[in-house]
């Protein structure tokens, strides 16, 4: 029987505590669009996306009205374009035409982001994958809604250090191409280890080749709800703390499951997964950092931060798994700097460093996310940071990622303004001791011993 108090509680979560469905992401396979003729390929891609996704935005709005739950973003992910363009694209410029087509299709159907301008190169790069990677800076500069990701490592295959080296330079080039907007292009580029096929969150979403022709994946956001729940158990022991987070995560995920099933039914597209992630926004009261403070830290970055984040992440998963028949994506707690006011405050207070953020990524959901660094940082230094983060994912059998923003023309202490959901970020210092000889070795780092399960 429905408890009236729980109805009021859910209503309060939405009205006062920033509970929302962050994204309904429609994954679309473009494998049947492949052609050796570039013009024909672009037309096929545009036609497929605008046909399959034509009702996505209106469906999201209908669900909002029906349940009173904000559905903040409606998005699309597609099959990695390095595969789709392999026959037709002979130069980086050819791939850029596909990026423009994706942007046009996204604009036509009304979604705010389209992910999948991607390459999966964890063991090696084909010529088309290298061309796509080389096209990323221009592609992200000439489009508004296209997001790019590159998977450079996995627990099963090791880390492709040739790709890591190349991407250090690509990240700087992307920053240079968009320097008039505080190097915003880099906010739409994610480097992965163990990238999931069903991630609904941008900028790392792509539609994996293991997926159906089309699929609905949903991501929910509720850091404010968790923080409010923890306010009622101040001073209690860790068992009570974890139990409170679990119960709250269950309720949050149940909302995502409801929306995902309804969207699937209305669009007649199979339901894929609910992503259990706690995704913050720059809004006050919608912060993962504030949860960590409520757990007992003065600021994120203080001693105990990694343990507090591990506890939070694990409890969210335990509660969320009970609420949905299928969970997936990234599933945990995001710790982006620019998208979380509490993280920004911690950086400004001198409590949170790049190295501490790296330690936190060992126990959380993604990785070094939305971190602004000086624009004069060397490409090899960026590659070294990427390699470190990929190693954490490879050894620990988890998804890790890097979304750094080298802001051209800015130095430590300056502020980079990205606007909207991406927020703003203080420029953080980077360790500038050289790793050139390490990065320049080339080849790949072998898979760890515990990857051999057969």
Swiss-Prot record:
Gene3D superfamilies, alphabetized: 3.20.70.20
Pfam assignment, any one: DUF711
Top-level taxon of the source organism: Bacteria
InterPro entries, alphabetized: UPF0210 (IPR007841)
UniProt cross-references to PANTHER family, sorted A to Z: UPF0210 PROTEIN MJ1665, UPF0210 PROTEIN SPR0218
Quaternary structure (record): Homodimer.
Annotated family: Belongs to the UPF0210 family.
UniProt xrefs under NCBIfam families: PRK05313.1 (NF003700)
Name the UniProt record assigns to this protein: UPF0210 protein Cphy_2797
